[in-house]
């Protein structure tokens, strides 16, 4: 296990185009290329553990992959049965979306992952897929990986999801593309929409009407992707928080997706008083541009709406809460408990270790702003917890243990961090 010591930062000014490529889009690029007629061309693909696992799975499913280090070309003449266990590593997105993709494929497939992924709930995917005819099973009656899939004919469906989850929605959309009739999917609030945007751009017949997504089965293979993957706003947000809590600091985050369902955390930071400006530069399946963030004194807010739009950024946003004036409140965020760790407990315990007053409830927590103090934090193998408390360290210094998990989403995180503060690594 490795550890990092982060030192308090002085005022900094950083402009960077080196934020990690978007993880959600990279996963989808690898998978959706399997549905295309022709060769998909993907530049700036995220070369992190999670997404490279998805790329390896696609190859194991019969795709031809040509990677020159800059552009990845993927071509496929259909999904083939693999003799390998399909290893999703740490990625819940990978496992859940592959369930939807493979549920109608000809063959038998086994999906597994690391010790953390094998503890995460999968019934939210396996249950609705089983209801439409998928032959899918796993431990605890399909709730835990490894998952076994035998491709089958799928029935048309009208599914009403009880949770707002882009992973559930995406899995059902992928299943719907090969169902025996038109399908619809509804959710209690709009979740992230990369799948709809990308598949529609490839020629899939998908219509979104409020909270209802309607999908027609594919009549033919889709057009291949040609995309430069934008920077990941979830990764960019760590450095936005660093600038927002460090007096006289600013950062410009270049080439980030400005998809409204992905920048809600920036909007929350803006409501707290941070000086944030968005600069659109292009549109490739979705808007892309630069985000400018400057330090300003922060005030407390309540976060309870559109939770699925900022669920991944809440740990980092909580560091901003700890530096704000007043009590910030998080509600309706019970989904945090089934991420790579129980992120409600890990955030609460981490902030308490840093001297911050925090109260935990079943679906969230409250944070009374104060002065962060240096502490020793265990990431619990969760990349977002690790990076969030490392960013907290720019205000006071911090030691964070078990940092290898950061490679699942942001391999060059420390290269960028070194541009704003001093870090030291140790092996335990």
From Swiss-Prot:
Reaction equation(s) it catalyzes: 3-phosphoshikimate + phosphoenolpyruvate = 5-O-(1-carboxyvinyl)-3-phosphoshikimate + phosphate
Entry keyword set: Amino-acid biosynthesis, Aromatic amino acid biosynthesis, Cytoplasm, Transferase
Gene Ontology molecular function: 3-phosphoshikimate 1-carboxyvinyltransferase activity
Higher taxonomy: Bacteria, Pseudomonadati, Campylobacterota, Epsilonproteobacteria, Campylobacterales
Annotated protein name in UniProt: 3-phosphoshikimate 1-carboxyvinyltransferase
Family: Belongs to the EPSP synthase family.
InterPro entries reported in the protein's UniProt record: Enolpyruvate_Tfrase_dom, Enolpyruvate_Tfrase_sf, EPSP_synthase, EPSP_synthase_CS, RNA3'P_cycl/enolpyr_Trfase_a/b
Enzyme class: transferase
Entry annotated with the keyword Acyltransferase: no
GO cellular component terms given for this protein: cytoplasm
Gene of this entry: aroA
E.C. no: 2.5.1.19
Organism: Sulfurimonas denitrificans (strain ATCC 33889 / DSM 1251) (Thiomicrospira denitrificans (strain ATCC 33889 / DSM 1251))
Taxonomic superkingdom: Bacteria
Pathway recorded for this protein: Metabolic intermediate biosynthesis; chorismate biosynthesis; chorismate from D-erythrose 4-phosphate and phosphoenolpyruvate: step 6/7
Quaternary assembly: Monomer.
Residues holding 3-phosphoshikimate: 23-24, 28, 165, 167, 312, 339
Protein role: Catalyzes the transfer of the enolpyruvyl moiety of phosphoenolpyruvate (PEP) to the 5-hydroxyl of shikimate-3-phosphate (S3P) to produce enolpyruvyl shikimate-3-phosphate and inorganic phosphate.
């Amino acid at each position: 296990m490795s550890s990092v010591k982060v030192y308090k930062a002085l005022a900094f000014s950083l402009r960077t185009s080196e934020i990690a490529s978007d993880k959600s889009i990279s996963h989808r690029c690898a998978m959706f290329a399997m549905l295309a007629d022709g060769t998909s061309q993907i530049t700036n693909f995220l070369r992190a553990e999670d997404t490279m696992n998805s790329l390896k799975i696609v190859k194991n499913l019969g795709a031809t992959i040509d990677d020159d280090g800059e552009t990845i070309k993927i071509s496929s003449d259909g999904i083939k049965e693999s003799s390998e266990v399909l290893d999703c590593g740490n990625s819940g997105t990978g496992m859940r979306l592959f369930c939807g993709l493979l549920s109608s494929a000809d063959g038998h497939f086994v999906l597994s992952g690391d010790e953390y992924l094998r503890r995460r709930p999968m019934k939210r995917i396996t249950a609705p897929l089983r209801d439409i005819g998928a032959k899918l099973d796993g431990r605890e009656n399909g709730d835990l990986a490894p998952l076994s899939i035998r491709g089958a004919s799928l029935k048309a469906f009208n599914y009403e999801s009880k949770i707002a989850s882009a992973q559930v929605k995406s899995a059902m959309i992928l299943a719907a593309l090969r169902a025996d009739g038109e399908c619809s999917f509804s959710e209690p609030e709009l979740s992230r929409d990369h799948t709809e945007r990308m598949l529609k751009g490839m020629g899939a017949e998908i219509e979104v009407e409020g909270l209802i997504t309607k999908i027609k089965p594919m009549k033919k293979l889709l057009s291949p992707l040609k995309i430069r993957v934008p920077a990941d706003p979830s990764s960019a947000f760590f450095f936005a928080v660093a600038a927002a809590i460090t007096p006289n600091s600013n950062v410009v985050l270049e080439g980030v997706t400005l998809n409204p369902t992905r920048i809600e955390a920036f909007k929350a930071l803006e409501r707290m008083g941070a000086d944030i400006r968005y600069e659109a530069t292009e549109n490739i399946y979705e808007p892309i541009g630069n985000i400018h963030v400057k330090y300003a004194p922060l005030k407390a807010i309540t976060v309870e709406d559109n939770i699925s739009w900022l669920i991944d950024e809440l740990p980092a946003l909580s560091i901003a809460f700890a530096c704000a004036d007043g009590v910030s409140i998080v509600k309706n965020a019970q989904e945090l408990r089934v991420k790579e760790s129980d992120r409600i407990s890990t955030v609460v315990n981490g902030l308490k270790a840093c001297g911050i007053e925090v109260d935990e409830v079943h679906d969230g927590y409250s944070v009374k702003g104060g002065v962060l103090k240096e502490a020793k934090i265990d990431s619990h193998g969760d990349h977002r917890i690790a990076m969030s408390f490392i960013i907290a360290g720019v205000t006071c210094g911090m030691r964070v243990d078990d940092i290898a998990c950061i490679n699942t989403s942001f391999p060059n995180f420390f290269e960028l961090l070194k541009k704003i503060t001093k870090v030291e690594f140790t092996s335990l």
